[in-house]
A protein has these predicted regions:
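Short amphipathic alpha-helical segment within the helicase RecA-like ATPase core
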Residues: 1-157, 162, 170, 175
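Gly/Ser-rich catalytic serine loop of serine hydrolases
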Residues: 177-180
Length: 180
């Protein structure tokens, strides 16, 4: 525990482990051989706190978040010839096994829905645009859960955005895949 801290020791321990776990990420899918000075990997971290059972339970939830962070980092680390709208949609479809409802719209469906602005972004691409809608209704509904208002997150998953290329500087253009 840190004297004067406004966070419980168990939460502090779990957050320390979570930070170390996030820091351990490494995208080396395309690495052909390890460099001479191989990046050190954290093999173990022991955090002592007075309520270790609570810290372990909190960290278990954080580990699931880290899995999602690593999945996202893997996606944005892929080059544009590997991750494009159809492959991103396929990756999203794989989340069905976790209870996520996934709907993928193609260009025809988007046109019928009047999504001209979105279609305009992708019209210069050789690949078809996709709209991926993911819905997760959570754990089985309790009375308390049913009384809560739904929460919606809206984001974009543009796999490579060179939009406005005439006004963007060329330096860093390769990083436009991080626009997700």
């Amino acid at each position: 525990a840190v004297e004067g801290a406004k966070i419980a020791a168990a939460d502090m321990g779990a957050n320390l482990g979570f930070g170390a776990l996030l820091r351990s990420y490494r995208f080396d899918k395309y690495r052909t051989k390890e460099p001479k000075e191989k990046k050190p990997l954290l093999k173990a971290l022991k955090v002592l706190c007075p309520t270790s059972a609570k810290a372990k339970a909190t960290f278990a939830d954080m580990e699931k978040v880290a899995d999602g962070v690593f999945f996202t980092r893997d996606l944005v680390s892929e080059p544009a010839n590997v991750l494009y709208p159809a492959t991103l949609a396929k990756e999203a479809q794989a989340l069905k096994k976790l209870g996520v409802k996934v709907t993928v719209l193609g260009e025809k469906e988007m046109a019928k829905l009047g999504m001209g602005a979105l279609l305009g972004v992708g019209q210069g691409s050789a690949r078809e645009s996709k709209m991926v809608i993911m819905e997760w209704t959570g754990v089985p509904k309790s009375k308390a859960a049913k009384a809560q208002q739904p929460v919606a997150f809206v984001g974009k998953g543009v796999t490579f955005d060179t939009g406005g290329i005439s006004i963007k500087p060329s330096a860093g253009m390769e990083d436009m895949k991080w626009d997700m």
